[in-house]
Amino acid sequence: MLSPRKVKYRKKQRGRLSGEAQKGNEISFGEYGLVSLETYFITARQIEAARVAMTRRVKRGGKVWIRIFPDVPYTKKPAETRMGKGKGGVDHWNAPVKLGTVMFEMAGVPRELAEAAMMLASSKLPVKTTFVVRRDLR
């Protein structure tokens, strides 16, 4: 699973996401993309599940790019622990995804296969998504 090798601060305050994506909102590498229609934190496990679903659907054909990275720590205290005694340990890593963010890209496969693979990956994610085609291919 994806996680940062080294971070400046091990734990972070939760914070909130708002607004639309100002960067990472255009297809840069591939021919097709999966774009978020909602703002949400996506876990490293969800990203990996979507990646596996996509690559299995295209059966070694084409190339897949993951455009989001889980670099925000999510802490959690152990079960049945009293309050206090400091902040809990890092439970997992999240990727902040805003509305309009291109999460995955794909190239080297027919459009129908790419769309089917992306929709399969979309079912593994907690956000509504849409399939997009690069502008110069339309």
Curated annotation (Swiss-Prot):
Annotated region described as Disordered, given as residue ranges: 1-20
Listed Basic residues bias regions: 1-15
The protein's assembly and partners: Part of the 50S ribosomal subunit.
Signal peptide: none
Cellular compartments per GO CC: cytosolic large ribosomal subunit
Alphabetically ordered keywords of this record: Ribonucleoprotein, Ribosomal protein, RNA-binding, rRNA-binding, tRNA-binding
Family named by the database record: Belongs to the universal ribosomal protein uL16 family.
One of the record's GO molecular function terms: rRNA binding
Name the UniProt record assigns to this protein: Large ribosomal subunit protein uL16
Entry's Gene Ontology BP terms: translation
Biological function: Binds 23S rRNA and is also seen to make contacts with the A and possibly P site tRNAs.
Transmembrane spans: none
